[in-house]
């Protein structure tokens, strides 16, 4: 019987065989990288919760456009969570739905919200950087490419939040209603 050669990007652990017969070839994901990417679901879903809570707080202080911006961004974070789930499904890995933590809501003003949101995005960016590093460490190139995609999104989000902080600083925090009128989610 002729030996079956698999493409280099398909690891042997991703092949299910019955004797010499290949039953299924699934895209490989290293088990240690899988654990990290599973955590990405929680990171993104927690982000959605945080931004939804921030939007609710901003509504309570009558900054309706900014509240809408944060609630729209919460939906964007849920979309990112779905990307992580879909990536795992495409790898024939069952995505594990995490428990979502109640966000801390100790904001006292808009500045606290903006600062907290930016710091949270830095945290998420660090997570995806570490995930990309681990994927490379285990030569899991598909996972690495996925992590790079998530990092591209993170760069965009850091720019968005940085822009909000710049707008806030231009208004010196005094003209919050004028600030609020200029906030629109892309």
Describe each model-derived feature in a short phrase:
Residues 1-186:
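Iron-associated oxidoreductase/ferritin-like identity signal
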């Amino acid at each position: 019987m002729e030996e079956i050669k698999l493409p280099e990007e398909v690891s042997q652990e991703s092949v299910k065989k019955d004797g010499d017969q290949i039953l299924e070839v699934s895209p490989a994901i290293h088990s240690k990288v899988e654990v990290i990417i599973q955590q990405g679901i929680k990171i993104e879903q927690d982000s959605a919760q945080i931004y939804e809570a921030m939007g609710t707080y901003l509504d309570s202080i009558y900054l309706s456009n900014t509240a809408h911006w944060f609630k729209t961004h919460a939906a964007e974070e849920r979309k990112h969570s779905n990307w992580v789930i879909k990536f795992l499904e495409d790898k024939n890995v069952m995505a594990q739905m995490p428990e979502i933590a109640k966000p801390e809501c100790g904001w006292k003003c808009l500045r606290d919200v903006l600062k907290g949101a930016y710091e949270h995005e830095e945290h998420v960016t660090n997570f995806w950087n570490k995930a990309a590093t681990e994927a490379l460490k285990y030569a899991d190139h598909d996972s690495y490419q996925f992590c790079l995609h998530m990092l591209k999104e993170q760069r965009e989000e850091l720019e968005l939040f940085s822009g909000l902080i710049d707008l806030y600083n231009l208004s010196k925090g005094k003209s919050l209603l004028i600030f609020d009128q200029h906030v629109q989610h892309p």
